[in-house]
Amino acid sequence: MTEIAADREIKICCATFYQSDLVRALFGDVFHPGGLALTYRLGQAIKLGPGDRVLDVACGRGASAVHLAERFCCHVTGLDYGVENVAAAQAHADDEGVAHLTTFRQGDAEGLPFDDGVFDAVISECSFCTFPDKATAAAEMARVLAVGGRLGLTDMTVNGQLPDDIQTLLAWVACVAGAGTPDAYAETLRRAGLGDFTIEDQRSALRDMVNGVRRKLMGVELAAGLGKLDLGDLDLDEGKRLARRAVELIEKGVAGYTLITAKKE
């Protein structure tokens, strides 16, 4: 398989995984550690305000985009690789009465379909580590930011080398295998032309989420056994193993979660 084909497989698997009934059973409509409370903290950290033009890269089903529009009265454009997610996000915005403040479209983080400098802020939650070409994604996010615009990321981090048994495709879509250190993320963003960094440790949010997923996996297994939930091609035993390993890695300080902000200067 060529590198381009492998990258495309990762993107398709990520989109399919995060549109699945299984993911909604495990996470609801908010897929990232910390939930909407951490989304609000991210909005504060990049100083969102009324009228700001915000891009949410890998917006999923739109929970964060809608929340930011409601709380900060900003105009949010959500972009996701999954067509079903885009439709669900628009429906969610309609239901919450913020359709006038939100727009959703399908697209690729490594080739953003927007002109240069059209956003005051760009965010991406628990997604940057899944992008196969992080340098290109960072350059694209910097490109669409206006001068003085702010970038905000929350994402998985890994300090040290991950064990071989967690370097799997499922680990990629579960935001583990492609993660780096906070400093590595910052360096990638710096090379894209961003600066003025802040970094916050948010590992407690990851620990809480993983423990919640482990509890819910028991219910998922029961529902699947009763024919009430389609697991598709997902190996549930592998999912449970990854969850156990994630807890071990968090406790050892190998895996974590971070909030990073930067500015286009």
Q: What do the PLM-derived regions correspond to, one by one?
A:
Residues 1-23:
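N-terminal, positively charged/glycine-rich alpha-helical extensions of SAM-dependent methyltransferases
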Residues 22, 156-176:
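Short, glycine-/aromatic-enriched active-site segment of Class I SAM-dependent methyltransferases
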Residues 32-50:
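Conserved alpha-helix/loop element of class I SAM-dependent methyltransferases that forms part
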Residues 55-57, 61-111:
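Class I SAM-dependent methyltransferase SAM/SAH-binding core
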Residues 110-121:
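A short acidic, Gly/Pro-enriched loop at the edge of an enzyme's catalytic core
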Residues 135-150:
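A short glycine-rich, Lys/Arg-flanked "PGG" loop and its adjoining helix->strand segment in the class I
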Residues 178-193:
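Short alpha-helix
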Residues 200-265:
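Conserved Class I S-adenosyl-L-methionine
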